[in-house]
């Protein structure tokens, strides 16, 4: 213990004063709204351009809306936010730069690809746990059309995608992290930080295969650091089963691995 928390193993921390997630705001595109998680989103947009002239502006608009929803639901103002940890998939973080411009909150721009939300929550929780902020905003966004332009081919090019190609989410999530003891919807008991694991995947159409080795390594590192055995696990589910699992989360203590799996410990 160092006054802030206990380091556990190679890459994990258990917070001495676990911060809470006070509120969240979520915005999705039309395709995402039609999926199994659609009913959990605060706002499903009928227009993926959000009424803007281009896709990049649309992604910025999603960030503005998600942040606004999180603040409104938490009955908080921009002036009460000490820091913002936010990011997107674009060069120079342009969606975040323009999307956060209207918030007037000190910003740490993050670029962690699909780990950005987990990274934002982790760094935000560390900041609050250490006493450097009372309220911190964590946010991440992506947009199918902007990601296609950035990493593959612009939609106007008309490139043919294989049926097995993964689809970048059009959406944004924002969460307000507050101090231990405050009313919240979840508690961040600790974090496990992942590392780069390159398995040699070179198919730009298969993002899942490229990310899976690092995600698996992080999960296994968490179990090792916290000395969790398979006997302590009550269940595990992929993101396909999240809708059913989510309904059981209330008043229960879970560890959530963003975009990968949900685990529950008997003695967490």
Question: PLM features: what roles do these ranges have?
Answer:
Residues 77-83, 134-135, 229-232:
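Short acidic capping loops at alpha-helix termini that bridge into adjacent secondary structure
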Residues 2-36, 64, 90-91, 99-135, ...:
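Claisen-condensing/thiolase-fold acyl-transfer catalytic domains that form or cleave C-C bonds
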Residues 55-59, 85, 106-118, 165-167:
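Active-site nucleophile and cofactor-binding loops and adjacent substrate-binding regions
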Residues 59-75, 123, 210-226:
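Short, well-ordered amphipathic alpha-helical segments that serve as non-catalytic structural scaffolds
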Residues 1-56, 153-221, 225, 261-267:
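Condensing-enzyme catalytic core mediating Claisen C-C bond formation in acyl metabolism
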Residues 78, 84, 88-94, 102-103:
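Anion-binding (especially nucleotide phosphate/pyrophosphate-binding) glycine-rich loop
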